[in-house]
Amino acid sequence: MVPVLLALLLLLGPAVSEETQAGNYSLSFLYTGLSKPREGFPSFQAVAYLNDQPFFHYNSEGRRAEPLAPWSQVEGMEDWEKESALQRAREDIFMETLSDIMDYYKDREGSHTFQGAFGCELRNNESSGAFWGYAYDGQDFIKFDKEIPAWVPLDPAAQNTKRKWEAEAVYVQRAKAYLEEECPGMLRRYLPYSRTHLDRQESPSVSVTGHAAPGHKRTLKCLAYDFYPRSIGLHWTRAGDAQEAESGGDVLPSGNGTYQSWVVVGVPPEDQAPYSCHVEHRSLTRPLTVPWDPRQQAE
């Protein structure tokens, strides 16, 4: 589930920027609620991230906040009983909001999804940004603007949500204080337990493979995997000249705290020029070049 959730997080807010990867830090939360849960997909789940690394999760079945590795081995980082109680309270409010939206649209029988993402960033130990937004069935629903401060409705049903969440002036001030004070404070508290993991550099392993059907062009694939941080440069060269990839280029989580990426080029049958995969990553002292050996051809 984590890779899918991380993709949603990137859509909902700027929690994991390349600048963050360069030494700044972020704390963010992703909530997902389902009107019709099914096996393996509970009605509510929450995942918390430090930078791009999930560090605890919670769902409506276990109703406990549970730290993920390597934070599961850390003592004193968080009071997990207290965090569990907080997540249970947030679950109740979150699912009540989903129910209100379904009532507004008079669709209690449909299958609907409500998602929320919020968090903050530190740069040089100072607050440098924050976000808080929700989506309903994949469409923007409501967001918090801390500069006004106010909830900004992005859907007709969100007018009701705004009225409810702004019924008392203190509600808005609490949301603003959370983004500007509480969230950065939590992040500062977590960092002494987390910097070693978040600042680590893991070099990519690189594999080049090829396949050709009789009478067709040869397809070369360069796969880089098990690298961290996320940013990587990856391309094929022909006799030293960079080639445009036919496919690939995305950087995806591997599920173990590292990333993977690949690029594919097509080579005409008559082309005998040397091809190499060129890799640039922060963990490497110099770019890595891995030549394609035609003897490795996979039939």
From Swiss-Prot:
Disulfide bonds join C120-C183, C222-C277. Its main location: secreted. Residues 204-289 form the Ig-like C1-type domain. InterPro entries: Ig-like_dom (IPR007110), Ig-like_dom_sf (IPR036179), Ig-like_fold (IPR013783), Ig/MHC_CS (IPR003006), Ig_C1-set (IPR003597), MHC_class-I_related (IPR050208), MHC_I-like_Ag-recog (IPR011161), MHC_I-like_Ag-recog_sf (IPR037055). Coiled coil: none annotated. Glycans are attached at N24, N125, N256. It comes from the Eukaryota. It is found in: Secreted. GO terms for biological process: antigen processing and presentation of endogenous peptide antigen via MHC class I via ER pathway, TAP-independent; antigen processing and presentation of endogenous peptide antigen via MHC class Ib; immune response; positive regulation of T cell mediated cytotoxicity. Keywords: Disulfide bond, Glycoprotein, Secreted, Signal. SUPFAM superfamilies: Immunoglobulin, MHC antigen-recognition domain. The keyword Glycoprotein applies. GO terms for cellular component: external side of plasma membrane; extracellular space. PROSITE patterns: IG_LIKE, IG_MHC. It holds the Pfam family MHC_I. Residues 1-17 form the signal peptide. Stimulates lipid degradation in adipocytes and causes the extensive fat losses associated with some advanced cancers. Belongs to the MHC class I family. Interacts with PIP. PANTHER family: MHC CLASS I-RELATED, ZINC-ALPHA-2-GLYCOPROTEIN. This is Zinc-alpha-2-glycoprotein. It comes from Bos taurus (Bovine).
